[in-house]
């Protein structure tokens, strides 16, 4: 990630992973990485599996999301599902509402939840894809 960030001229998307601030695993991003991705205008996709969030439930996922928001800002955090069958997630796509509900129950404003649940990723795609 350091090499990518050193040469990035457009928003960097970390499609799926975790953050060391809530789950100190080798693959997860440091606070410095979070800030540097945000500085590119990019998005950090928070994953749903144990190695990414150190848990197998919506609470661990939301803790990682909230931590990333606290470091990178709400405009730079999104979902990183990785629903490809390789990882074990606590739910399938029908369970995404659980993330929304948990963010709401913790007092996050609806406009911020909308950004995390897809708005930030759409913003980057619109900025970066041809014809946008």
Range-by-range predicted roles:
Residues 4, 78-80, 114-118:
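Beta-strand segments within the central parallel beta-sheet cores of soluble alpha/beta enzyme folds
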Residues 48, 72-93:
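Short acidic/histidine-rich active-site segments
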Residues 38-53:
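A conserved active-site cap/scaffold subdomain adjacent to cofactor or substrate pockets
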Residues 91-132:
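Mid-to-C-terminal alpha-helical segments outside catalytic/metal-binding sites
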Residues 16, 44, 82, 113, ...:
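Conserved, mostly hydrophobic/aromatic
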Residues 18-28, 51-62:
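Active-site glycine- and acidic-residue-rich loops that bind
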Residues 1-13, 26-41, 59-75:
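Histidine/acidic residue-rich metal-binding segments in metalloenzymes
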Residues 8, 18-19, 48-50, 83-85:
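Active-site-proximal loop/turn and secondary-structure-junction residues that shape catalytic pockets
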